Amino acid sequence: MTELKNDRYLRALLRQPVDVTPVWMMRQAGRYLPEYKATRAQAGDFMSLCKNAELACEVTLQPLRRYPLDAAILFSDILTVPDAMGLGLYFEAGEGPRFTSPVTCKADVDKLPIPDPEDELGYVMNAVRTIRRELKGEVPLIGFSGSPWTLATYMVEGGSSKAFTVIKKMMYADPQALHALLDKLAKSVTLYLNAQIKAGAQAVMIFDTWGGVLTGRDYQQFSLYYMHKIVDGLVRENDGRRVPVTLFTKGGGQWLEAMAETGCDALGLDWTTDIADARRRVGNKVALQGNMDPSMLYAPPARIEEEVATILAGFGHGEGHVFNLGHGIHQDVPPEHAGVFVEAVHRLSEQYHR
């Protein structure tokens, strides 16, 4: 494989010295960019864009042409795994993702296959290989998956949810069915991420978008336990380099200590967690990624820079910080403001790495 020209992101995740704090943005390939909208229109719809390796590669690279980002992230969706299990994913205008056959009971779970990542999810691996080739070693490529709990919420609710009553009903009334589903998902996600690593992903991230809707005890049993299983099953070395793993539970700031015990390399923080506090609690064990409120990108440039400076000062001197937003960039943010953000992170962080 090509020599990596900028490995700042991978080094920071392993808490090794870097010259400046690396930065990337969740959903950096997305609807805030006019060029993304044009490519998506060319593809026809969102899943067609995900399933076309050349177009998925094009949108992955678009933000890197605009901004000096320190990592590329595979353009895909967390719902590729349930889609490959045969749930019939489709997108309803204004409603987001839906499934034609949601999981309602243990019998439904028993019927679900564990997808072969090189077969049913082969289009994702093709995209990873294509992107790695086109990156030419400029920056590392991040692979990702949704967490078992987060994928299960969509599969049981039949799509997006606000109250999560359907899956919580299963959790409390039929926990066996939910554990069976989560176990199957943990196996599927482990295979899926390992296939991404084999195809060329140089780091992986597990997005637990909905872990924060659980009580502490339920989080341990129904979300963290299964993420821990995945971390245990991942290939951690490829191409002679360590493959760092980041766990991100949105709304999970109160559980950082437990998350750091899983053996992951880094934790993603949302914007509701104080980064100085997070570093005090777990900084001797894991790197931290985050954590500016994505809505801050609506602010004038000077205010964005001020917020970047505050977060950098909060983390302080030394290694183990990857700058990011606390969740995905919003679709109506001015692209220039994202540029201000990225440039400010590099310029203002230098003093913390001397």
From Swiss-Prot:
This chain's protein is named Uroporphyrinogen decarboxylase
Enumerate the catalysed reactions.
uroporphyrinogen III + 4 H(+) = coproporphyrinogen III + 4 CO2
Which Pfam families does UniProt cross-reference here? URO-D (PF01208)
- The species this protein belongs to is Escherichia coli (strain 55989 / EAEC)
Q: Which UniProt keywords apply?
A: Cytoplasm, Decarboxylase, Lyase, Porphyrin biosynthesis
On assembly, the entry states: Homodimer.
Please tell me which top-level EC class this enzyme sits in. Answer: lyase
Q: So, what pathway does this thing act in?
A: Porphyrin-containing compound metabolism; protoporphyrin-IX biosynthesis; coproporphyrinogen-III from 5-aminolevulinate: step 4/4
Report whether Lyase shows up as a keyword of the record: yes
Localisation per UniProt entry: Cytoplasm
Q: Name the positions where substrate binds.
A: R27, Q28, A29, G30, R31, D77, Y154, T209, H327
Lineage, broadest ranks: Bacteria, Pseudomonadati, Pseudomonadota, Gammaproteobacteria, Enterobacterales
Q: Where is this site: Transition state stabilizer?
A: D77
Which gene underlies this protein? hemE
Matching PROSITE patterns, A to Z? UROD_1, UROD_2
Annotated NCBIfam families: hemE (TIGR01464)
Q: Name one GO cellular component term.
A: cytosol
Q: Which family does it belong to?
A: Belongs to the uroporphyrinogen decarboxylase family.
Gene Ontology BP, a term: protoporphyrinogen IX biosynthetic process from glutamate
Assign the protein's first listed, main location to one coarse class. cytoplasm
Known function: Catalyzes the decarboxylation of four acetate groups of uroporphyrinogen-III to yield coproporphyrinogen-III.
The EC designation for this entry is: 4.1.1.37
- GO molecular-function term, one example from the UniProt record: uroporphyrinogen decarboxylase activity
